[in-house]
């Protein structure tokens, strides 16, 4: 699982829309969409807030393996 897929899965687990996640991170819905489609990656300044939001360590977020449901 790549980072974009992981962000998508985590967002869905939290029942957040792309717009809601974008609002929480102060980025646009389009930015979230690009992250999820691996067209771009989050800046380092957004990695920590993403981890905080999903209650993960940076290592857990950046690992490329299946998320347990």
Which residues does each predicted region cover?
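Short basic helix-loop element that most often maps to the first helix and adjoining turn
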Residues: 5-24
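Short, Lys/Arg-enriched C-terminal cap helix and immediately downstream tail that follows
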Residues: 8, 44-45
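Recognition helix of helix-turn-helix/homeodomain-like DNA-binding domains
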Residues: 27-40, 66
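DNA major-groove recognition helix of helix-turn-helix/homeodomain DNA-binding modules
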Residues: 45-60
């Amino acid at each position: 699982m790549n980072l974009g897929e992981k962000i998508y899965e985590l967002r869905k687990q939290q029942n957040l829309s792309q717009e809601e996640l974008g609002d929480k991170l102060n980025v646009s819905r389009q930015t979230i969409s690009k992250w999820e489609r691996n067209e771009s990656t989050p800046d380092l300044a957004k990695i920590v807030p993403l981890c905080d939001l999903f209650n993960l360590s940076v290592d857990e977020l950046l690992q490329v393996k299946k998320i347990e449901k």
